[in-house]
Design a protein with these regions (language model features):
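Flavin (primarily FAD) cofactor-binding/catalytic cores of flavoenzymes
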Residues: 1-34, 77-259
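N-terminal glycine-rich dinucleotide-binding loop that anchors FAD/FMN and/or NAD(P) in oxidoreductases
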Residues: 41-70, 214-239
Length: 259
């Protein structure tokens, strides 16, 4: 019996697998490597994170993105050089071969629990028991369309439903939202000769500022750079995640929204 079952083989699932292996904890990992990145993310997508903040986990046994790029002849910079979706997906597949070569493609279809163990059922028909389960299935299963728009689904889609935007050429498209997905979708629509209009409940759009090494010293001191954004709040959250975890839920949600 494996001590841990990891569900999902994207960046987080692979990072967990690497750490479990480092600690000599027995595990089984299920999923298809980087599936969402390969099949559900839009063509032309660029990561919001900088190169130095796009490594899969922090375990020393996991090669960094910089190492992957150097080995395979791809350009790389800690900051200022956008990372393409396809490059990151290839990096993930390369990492999987090293930290989780025993990845199983079976899908978990049911989880139950008794007093001591979790019971896992796979689509292959196999059933197994484990002490711990890590769910690392990503966010695509949580795509949200407001109920006020549900009756117009014939002409409304969620951004996660599109790999390409070729069919929108020459058409006016309203994009609702002001985050990563919304602004990225608007940019990709524009690149395909569509006419996007962004609707958001904010007076201004806040997007990536210039990387830290391009800012003047006073700005870097007042708002230091971290892997999750600029500012002391983001830096402390990154360096002391256990302290952040103990903050009240409302405070954590507020910080996450503002970072």
């Amino acid at each position: 019996m494996a001590d841990v079952v990891v569900i999902g083989a994207g960046p987080y699932g692979l990072a967990v697998a690497a750490e479990l292996r480092r600690r000599s904890v027995s595990f089984r990992i299920f999923g298809r490597v980087m599936e969402s990145w390969e099949q559900r993310m839009p063509e032309g997508m660029l990561l919001k994170s900088e190169g130095f903040a796009s490594n899969i986990g922090t375990c020393s046994s996991v090669p960094t993105l910089e190492h992957f790029c150097a080995r395979h002849g791809h350009p790389y910079a800690d900051t200022g050089l956008p990372i393409a979706r396809g490059l990151f997906a290839d990096y993930g597949s390369w990492v999987q071969a090293q930290v989780a070569p025993e990845l199983e493609s079976a899908r978990v279809i049911a989880i139950a629990r008794d007093e001591h163990r979790f019971m896992i059922e796979l689509d292959s028909g196999e059933r197994l028991r484990t002490s711990q389960v890590v769910v690392a299935t990503g966010l695509l299963g949580h795509a949200f369309v407001p109920e006020q728009l549900a009756h117009t689904r014939a002409c409304i889609t969620h951004s996660s439903e599109h790999r390409t935007f070729d069919d929108f050429a020459g058409r006016e498209v309203v994009v609702v939202g002001a985050g990563q997905s919304a602004l990225e979708t608007a940019a990709l629509l524009l690149a395909k000769a569509a006419l996007p209009v962004v609707l958001a409940r904010t007076a201004e759009l806040v997007w990536n500022t210039a990387p830290g090494d391009r800012r003047r010293a006073p700005s870097r001191l007042l708002r230091p750079q971290s892997g999750i954004g600029l500012g002391w709040r983001a830096l402390i959250t990154e360096r002391a995640p256990q302290a952040f975890r103990h903050l009240p839920a409302a405070t954590r949600h507020s910080y996450a929204f503002q970072t």
